[in-house]
């Protein structure tokens, strides 16, 4: 009996390390789940309101396009070209330039240099306003530009008239984008969401009034866009300057006029990076495919693109916050969580586009020909949505880390040396038309670009990046500290 008891005791002792390993594994698993949940909450505090805000602001253009589509095919084509080509180009550039604030404000907020957020925003206003002036010729000469690229005279002339009416919205971008980044970086995202909701509701009512009540036609639809965007700017500006952001808005500062060249260079890199990203979602027409059909697909893609771009903003802020606080590992963890969640959402929307391909065209047009053309492009649209669910998030990592210039070169290389040549071969050599051009740019340019960015972020020394962020925050805040 004694021997058996000793043997049993020996077996129990042998099991103890195994039991400890199981307990430790369970504890680690539970800790990982808690970390994922905590990071998800932090991310969605930014991404949730950002999605609502971006969808609301972009919906202003989509609703305008829908109203114009029911006025006639010429009106739909003209307003679509203005929204997707003229405004889209300038919006992408200015939106990207404003994302420089995600680097600077995000890292300053993480380092508790709160007063610098207001100074950075004022610098951004100045830089974006000056760039807005430089971009004005695109609006004044929209008709000859569109004719040069092969648009019919009637569409080009009407587009040129609408473009002039879009100038107030163009200048609203220069103030709205810095304001929204200012709030995002200090986690006041509900303010932007409420402001955007008010502007969207007002837009729907005023658009109906101008088009059906006052019979102002397609010019009336563009006038409502101006009113809605400036209403948004007014709400955000008033909230910030009336004492609701005491730590980050300390009034107008002469510091806003210092170091503008450094700020402009970072902003230009950001703008170029995001503009190329938006261009790569597809922007070429084919005479065999109705302009209306492609514009509808671009509007749907652009609307869904607001979700990855919200993750772009959220990832930029989260990575910048953690790097500014010196937490390199947490910055990497935030990046992984953001990429995975954006990819899941992209898969869901891709499936929805394929499933609803017979219905989505009716929102924008009553023409059977246009709706059938949209149906033919729906599979490619679904793949575009899926591929674009990852790349913007990785670009957000670049913004949070301050790599804008480097990533802009990657974007340029992939777009001009891979995407466009492949699109040319598929579109003209293999006679696939616009679908071939579109597929070449997306599958060639975006896919290669995404793989390169994945390689870069996976090999990144995050602790070294955290040190760089600390140096950057000190550099940009030294002048204010001396004051």
Task: List the predicted regions and their residue ranges.
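Interhelical loop/hinge segments that connect adjacent transmembrane helices in multipass membrane
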Residues: 2-47, 218, 222-228, 234-274, ...
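Small-residue-rich hydrophobic transmembrane alpha-helices
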Residues: 62-65, 76-136, 140, 176-185, ...
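Signature of the first transmembrane helix
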Residues: 16-27, 41-102, 265-281
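Membrane-interface helix-loop junctions in multi-pass transport and translocation proteins
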Residues: 33, 39, 157, 190-191, ...
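Helix-terminus/linker motif at the lipid-water interface of multi-pass membrane proteins
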Residues: 58-77, 146-153, 209-216, 268-299, ...
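Alpha-helical transmembrane segments of multi-pass membrane proteins
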Residues: 89, 137-138, 153-179, 194-195, ...
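Interfacial segments at transmembrane-helix termini and the short loops linking adjacent helices
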Residues: 37, 146-166, 283-294, 356-382, ...
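Transmembrane helical elements of multi-pass membrane transporters/channels
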Residues: 45-64, 225-232, 236, 240, ...
């Amino acid at each position: 009996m004694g021997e058996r008891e000793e043997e049993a005791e020996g077996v129990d002792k042998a099991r103890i390390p195994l039991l400890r390993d199981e307990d430790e594994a369970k504890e680690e698993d539970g800790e990982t789940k808690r970390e994922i949940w905590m990071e998800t909450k932090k991310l969605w505090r930014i991404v949730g309101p950002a999605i609502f805000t971006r969808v609301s602001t972009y919906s202003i253009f989509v609703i305008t396009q829908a109203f114009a589509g029911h006025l006639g095919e010429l009106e739909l084509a003209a307003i679509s070209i203005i929204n997707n080509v003229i405004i889209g180009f300038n919006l992408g550039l200015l939106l990207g330039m404003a994302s420089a604030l995600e680097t600077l404000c995000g890292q300053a907020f993480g380092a508790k240099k709160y007063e610098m957020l207001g100074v950075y925003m004022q610098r951004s206003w100045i830089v974006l306003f000056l760039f807005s002036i430089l971009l004005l010729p695109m609006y004044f000469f929209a008709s000859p530009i569109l004719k040069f690229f092969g648009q019919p005279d009637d569409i080009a002339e009407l587009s040129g008239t609408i473009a002039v009416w879009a100038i107030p919205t163009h200048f609203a971008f220069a103030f709205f984008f810095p304001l929204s980044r200012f709030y995002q970086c200090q986690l006041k995202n509900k303010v932007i969401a409420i402001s955007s909701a008010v502007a969207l509701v007002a837009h729907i009512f005023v658009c109906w009034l101008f088009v059906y009540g006052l019979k102002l036609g397609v010019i009336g639809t563009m006038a409502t866009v101006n009113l809605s965007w400036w209403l948004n700017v007014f709400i955000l500006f008033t909230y910030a300057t009336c004492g609701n952001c005491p730590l980050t808005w300390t009034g107008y500062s002469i510091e806003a006029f210092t170091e503008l060249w450094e700020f402009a260079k970072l902003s230009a890199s950001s703008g170029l990076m995001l503009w190329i990203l938006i261009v790569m979602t597809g922007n070429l027409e084919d005479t065999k495919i109705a302009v209306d059909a492609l514009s509808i697909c671009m509007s749907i893609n652009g609307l869904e693109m607001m979700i990855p771009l919200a993750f772009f903003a959220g990832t930029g802020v989260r990575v910048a916050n953690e790097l500014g606080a010196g937490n390199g590992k947490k910055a990497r963890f935030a990046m992984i969580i953001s990429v995975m969640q954006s990819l899941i959402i992209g898969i869901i929307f891709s499936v929805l586009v394929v499933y609803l391909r017979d219905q989505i065209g009716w929102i924008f047009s009553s023409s059977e020909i246009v709706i059938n053309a949209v149906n033919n492009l729906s599979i490619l649209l679904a793949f575009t949505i899926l591929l674009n669910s990852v790349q913007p998030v990785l670009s957000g990592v670049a913004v949070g880390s301050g790599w804008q210039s480097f990533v802009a070169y990657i974007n340029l290389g992939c777009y001009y040396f891979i995407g466009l040549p492949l699109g040319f071969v598929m579109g003209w050599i293999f006679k696939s038309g616009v679908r071939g051009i579109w597929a070449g740019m997306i599958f060639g340019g975006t896919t290669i670009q995404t793989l390169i960015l994945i390689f870069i972020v996976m090999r990144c020394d995050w602790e070294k990046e955290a040190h760089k962020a600390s140096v950057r925050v000190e550099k940009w805040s030294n002048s204010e500290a001396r004051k």
